[in-house]
From Swiss-Prot:
Sequence repeats lie at residues 32-36, 37-41, 42-46, 47-51. Residues 1-21 form the signal peptide. This is Chorion class B protein L11. This protein is one of many from the eggshell of the silk moth. GO terms for molecular function: structural constituent of egg chorion. Residues 32-51 are annotated as: 4 X 5 AA approximate tandem repeats of G-Y-G-G-L. GO terms for biological process: chorion-containing eggshell formation. GO terms for cellular component: egg chorion. Belongs to the chorion protein family. Keywords: Repeat, Signal.
Amino acid sequence: MAAKLILFVCATALVAQSALGIGCGCGCGGRGYGGLGYGGLGYGGLGYGGYGGGCGRGFSGGGLPVATASAAPTGLGIASENRYEGTVGVCGNLPFLGTADVAGEFPTAGIGEILYGCGNGAVGITREGGLGFGAGYGGGYGLGYGGYGGGYGLGYGGYGGCGCGCGY
């Protein structure tokens, strides 16, 4: 009975870690295939200072840009109880979706008109600006190939050929 309980607790912990955890690569102590070896590349991608692929980049502000802004105004109103004679023009842009209403009496000698347009016919976000360029070294030859691994590697097998610790 105790073995079943231990198996259940370990399986629950494994499921929770695989669902909620961040995979930082594999390997022994940051070496081998999950770290600095394998021709200067990390775990299936770019080694990031001894970490495996994807470790520490999503939550440290490096590769996940986030932009926030205040909420758009929910309404825009123009109200007047004055009497205007002549041509009156009101011009502006309403955010995303807007309505226009004219209330009151128009004399038969004048005209009242509302011109309403919505860009190209689609109501929604029409343009999003980029966040600029990310910080990093833009060397023409790159930093990964022949970096720390460089054909000798840091595997546990001494000077293994590819650095993954397997001795090849």
